[in-house]
Amino acid sequence: KDFNLEVLVRTTCMQKGYQLRSNLKNPEIYKNYNVLNPEDFKALLTAYVQAHGDVRAENQSLARRATFDATATLYVVGDVHSGITALVGFLTRLRDDGVLGNDGQLAATARVIFLGDLVDRGVWGAEVLYVALQLWEKNRDKVFVLRGNHENHSQHEEYGFGAELDAFNDEAIRQLVKQMCERLPEVLFATVRTERFVFCHGGIPHYADSSPVAFFDGGDGFFNTTEGATTSNPHADSQWQWNDFDLSEDATTRSRRDGNNGTMFVIGRLATAKFKTQHKVRQIVRGHEDTNSLRLEYVTTTSEFTINASTATNKLPPDFDKLVDAADVITTSIAYPAKIPSTTTPLFFVLITNKGTD
């Protein structure tokens, strides 16, 4: 509650990650690890719901739009997936760098963007959600929490977060979480200095490269889409949450993929490039899946790039801007805490500053 970060670090579930992964639907598991005060959790969820009144209708997407000036530094966080150790490690670094105060206040120039999938796949989803919303509550104009496909009520029953909520034995918490998730924006259209960036969890919709929608115009709110009501259901409500990219040389357009999780679209290189050109977008930054896009880590290896960044200085190569522009899409790293039984799992993120992309 007072942002004492060390107190939030609990390592038991990380050490038992493999055993837990096969048992995430059992509410009894979560009772062993819950450290939240339910009333504090409900108060924070209520604050978010009250601050965001409208829920999007069918065939609409909910967008945030923002302009960041030359002094802004953006910290863009990929999939946390209940990884409280990773999240606290990230916040601890911000604190140590003087970006985050012990009172939870971010520096005047700092902005934090969560790309979705905060919950599921581990036992600390509620704690991760609580910490992220605490950061938002203390910095409402500086923190953006986007909706991933795992911020979807139907997914919670499949990947563990539903059982975690059941462990509270409080239906009000479950309903507040549902209402909060329904109010999370699916995409952030941001102008960083004079350059346009798209931040989302999944991928651009299949119609986006030919869309008349002026994505970057106007303020926050809804915009109509041409995606059908069943396009991404039941897995997610929007293609911004669920679509993927295929950036191999022979993937030039888009394809439809039907599976157990519903229907989604895979966007190829030509459609991606056309979208970026049409809407004057420098780069798309997303999470969701490992594709053959430029994937950002302290040490990253892809088929196209190998980026070695010193873990001592956390500096990326001086020509990194060129790599960013050469990439079709940037994919942030994904934390799977239940697969990595480590107490020091790092949470990788993109840092965009007035000196370029670092």
Language-model segment annotations:
Residues 1-358:
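Feature recognizes metal-dependent phosphohydrolase scaffolds
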